Amino acid sequence: MSKLAAPLPLTDGHLLEDFDSGQPSLNEFLQQHALAKQRAMLSRTYVATRENRVVGYYTLAFVTLNSAEAPRRIGRGMPDSIPALLLARLAVDRREQGRGLGRSLLVDALRRVWEVMAHGHAPVRVLVVDAIDESAARFYSRFDMTPSPV
């Protein structure tokens, strides 16, 4: 098996066609929408690859949370809008599942969020996640992640 490359921003050169996470909507987003949304500056998708073939990805986007809808520990004492980064998608190809790649992608996302926060690149108070289903929600809950109200 070829070496796994660290996550980098998605480009035209990445091979997407064979990606299959088992979740059709996650496959479709990567293969048909991720690059266009990135070019429009709506989100940024980072991909892990083997020989340029995408084996996992995650997508980050800036959002604002309504403080009244946010969990108390986040919304208490905050103005009406709370700046946040949304981990909108995280998916691993079926052939790579069960090997820790999902965890590695989450750690990489957290590192990038920390860099944004620590260096003041953008005002971000919190990272929230959008779990696609109960299985994903359980995955995120193991890392004390807060489901997104957006």
Predicted regions and their residues:
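Short, well-ordered amphipathic alpha-helices
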Residues: L30, L106-V116
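Short amphipathic alpha-helix that is part of the acyltransferase structural core
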Residues: M1-A36, A40
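Conserved acyl-donor/pantetheine-binding loop and adjacent beta-alpha core of acyl/acetyltransferases
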Residues: Y57-R89, H121
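Short coil/loop residues immediately preceding or within conserved phosphate-binding loops
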Residues: S43, I82, V124-V126
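Conserved acetyl-CoA pyrophosphate-binding loop and the N-cap/start of the following alpha-helix
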Residues: E96-A109
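Conserved beta-hairpin
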Residues: M41-F62
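Residue-level recognition of the GNAT/N-acetyltransferase active site
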Residues: A88, D93, I132
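Conserved active-site alpha-helix within GNAT-family acetyltransferase domains
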Residues: W114, A118-V150
